[in-house]
Amino acid sequence: HLCDRRQRQMCIRDRAKNIGCSWRISSDIRPEWGSVKYIIDKNLYLSAYAGDGHYNDMDMLEIGRGLKPEEEEVHFGMWCIMSSPLLIGCDLTTIPEASLKLLKNKELIALNQDPLGLQAYVVQHENKGYVLVKDIEQERGKVRAVALYNPSDSICDFSVPMSVLEMGGKVKMRDLVKQKDLKAVQGTLNRQLPAHSVLILRMEAEQRLEPVRYEAEWAYLPCFNDLGLRPKTILYAPMKEASGGMKVSYLGGRAENYAEWNKVYSEKGGMYEMTIQYVPHADRKLEIRVNNEKSILLKDLAGTDGQQLASVTVQVRLKPGNNVVRMGSPYCWAPDIDCFTLKKIE
C-alpha cells in the first residue's frame, strides 16, 4: 500500500503496480461531509488506474462518527462502487445500530468485492448530479452497477437515457442500499434525489448495447499526476461546454504524453467513422493510433475565432472485441480533447 504523499505521484503509473496493490489519492479523511465529498471528487475521474488487483484507496470509513444517515449512505455506497479498500475507522463498541447495519450491508460489500474489480466511471454530469456505472459479474454482460450521486446542497433531478448506460429493453433494478427491488425501467430513468444523497443500483438489461461515445476523462494518461509540482502537466480539467463537463488538457509535446482508451468495444469489428470533439487552438496536431496500426495525423486544428469546440472525423478499422485507441502528438501540443464517438459504416 502506498500512503506517503510523495509516492502518490507514482501511484497512477504502471511502476506503482510493482510496489503495492493500492494507493492513497488524497489527504486524510475526516468525519465531515466536506471531507467525504472532496475525496469522491478526487476519485471521479481516476477509474482508468484501478482494476486488475490494484485500487484507488479513498481512506478509512468514517461510518458511525457523526455524519447524517444519507451522508453515510453516500460514503459507504460510493466507496463500494468505486472499489476502494474498506477499512473500518470507528469504535465498533459504540457505533449506532443504523450505522452498523449499513456497514454490514452484504449487497454493498458484494459490489465492492465483485471479482471484476472495476471502478465505476462517470457517464453523465448534469444538474449538479453525477451518474456512474461499471460492469459487474461479467465484462460486457447485461448486469451493471449504477450510482446516481447528488453532492449538492439542494434537490437534484436525474434523467438518464438507458443508452448512456449501454442498456436496452426492459431493465430490472434493485436498490442496494435499501436492499429492495424497484420497478423495471425502459427508455429513461428519472429520479429526484435530496441533497447529499446517492442511489446505488444493480441493473439487469434485456440487451447490452454497443458503446457510441468515449469521454476523454475515461482515458489512461501515463504522464498524469495530481501533485501540482509542474506547470502544464496533462490533466482532467472541467469544461462546461464539454459533453461530460470535462476534457483532457496539456496532451502531447512528447511521445509518452498520450491518452489511451483500452476498451473501445466493437461487437463484430469493421470500419467506423470516428468523430473527435476537441478544443480548437492554433499550431496543434493530433496523432491517432488504433491497435498499434499506422497512425493518422491530423493538422490544421485551429478552428474559428471564438469557437469553444470543434470536431473532425476519420475512418478507423476496429477488430471484434476490445480495441486500443491512443491519441497524442509527439512533437508539439495536441488540442484539448472532449470525447470521441463511433459510427459503424454499413
Predicted regions: what they are:
Residues 69, 99, 106-154, 178-179:
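Catalytic cores of transferase enzymes with a strong primary signal for eukaryotic protein kinases
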Residues 96-98, 104, 108, 162-171, ...:
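Active/binding-pocket-proximal capping segment
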